[in-house]
Each structure stands twice: as structure tokens, then as C-alpha cells.
Design a protein with these regions (language model features):
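Short, charged amphipathic alpha-helical surface segments
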Residues: 51, 56, 61-114
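Basic helix-turn-helix/winged-helix DNA-binding cores
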Residues: 1-65
């Protein structure tokens, strides 16, 4: 399977597929005559897993550890859930603060600076 076909099948851009190869997340074979990448079922399976983990905002280093069997999947998912909860709390605080600024009806940047410093 070509990189174009792999991209269509997985929903991952060709650029990202090449990057994942460079990072050592996938290992496509190469055609002898033209050095084109060839993706097999295992490459596609790994790409789909990478796609799923990236949707969870998981770092590539952690994904690699999971795919290589160096990190337990359930443990990684629990850690990621905690990371997402922390991000959610920070975003909620930022949204709340944004609303507070709007409610004060401050229109001048100097006023905002004095009011919240």
C-alpha cells in the first residue's frame, strides 16, 4: 500500500505519516527499485492506534512506549485522563476569568490592567 492509500485509510496526513516514521513509530518497507514506502497491515494498525492516541492528546513519546510494549496501556490511559482533567480545570478557570472581565465592562486595556493586577 502506498503512503497516499495509507493516508486515506487512516485519516492521517502524508506529512504526519512520514514524521511518525522518522520518530520510529512505524517501519514501512521500501521498494528496491524506487525506494517508495510500502505500508502493510501492521503499519496501518499502528497508524490507527497513533491516530486514536493523538485524539486523546497523548504525547508521541508516550505513544511510542505503549506501541513498543514498554508502558502498560491501562496505566497510560489513567495518566492521560488525569492530564486531561487538569487541562479541563485550567480551561474552566480561564473561561471563568474571561467572563469576569466581560462582566466588569472594562473597555480600556489600562483599566483592565489596574483591576486585575
Amino acid at each position: 500500500m502506498t503512503i497516499k492509500e495509507a493516508a486515506l485509510l487512516t485519516g492521517i496526513t502524508r506529512q504526519n505519516i512520514r514524521y511518525y516514521e522518522k520518530m520510529g513509530l512505524i517501519y514501512p518497507s521500501r521498494e528496491k527499485e524506487n525506494q517508495y514506502r510500502k505500508y502493510n497491515k501492521e503499519d496501518i494498525r499502528r497508524l490507527k492506534l497513533i491516530y486514536m492516541f493523538r485524539k486523546l492528546d497523548m504525547p508521541l513519546e508516550e505513544i511510542q512506549q505503549i506501541l513498543d510494549g514498554r508502558k502498560d496501556l491501562q496505566e497510560a490511559l489513567e495518566q492521560q485522563k488525569e492530564q486531561l482533567r487538569q487541562k479541563q480545570q485550567k480551561l474552566a478557570a480561564a473561561l471563568s476569568f474571561c467572563g469576569e472581565i466581560q462582566e466588569t465592562e472594562l473597555t480600556d486595556l489600562n483599566e483592565i490592567g489596574r483591576a486585575h493586577v
